[in-house]
Amino acid sequence: MSPKGRRHEIVRLELGYRFTRQASRDVFVAPEPQFNLGPDTFLVPDVLLHPRAIATPDVRGSDALLVVEVAETSLAYDLKTKAMLYAAHGVPEYWVINASTLMTTMHTPPSGNAYASAPEIAPDKLLVPTMVPGLAISLDSLGLQ
């Protein structure tokens, strides 16, 4: 895996900060957790949102409310390989944010080893997680353009 660049870290940290400030008490925002998808499969997403009632190490794919990957050098891998893994394990919503352009690919809902929909959303548009509609963010608001 490639080392994370400066821009990647800024986007990841700002996103985590904004989500944490907006999240209700029943939603936990986990930065870079070990996410156990199955007995032999785990990934470390940049941000994982899940019900606070479930401890982060116990969260499985279908428990997740939102998984976010910020991609700088790993964009193709995050859009293909990780999307297949997350879909196959029932993650209901998966975002890939291009750290350079702030374009976001919103994958929903899982269907087998893929997602039924994966539109690309511009940074000036409001991103609203389907499982956590109280959280909304426009990546333009991060002030990184």
Feature roles, as predicted:
Residues 1-145:
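Gly/Pro/Ser/Thr-rich low-complexity, intrinsically disordered segments predominantly at protein N-termini
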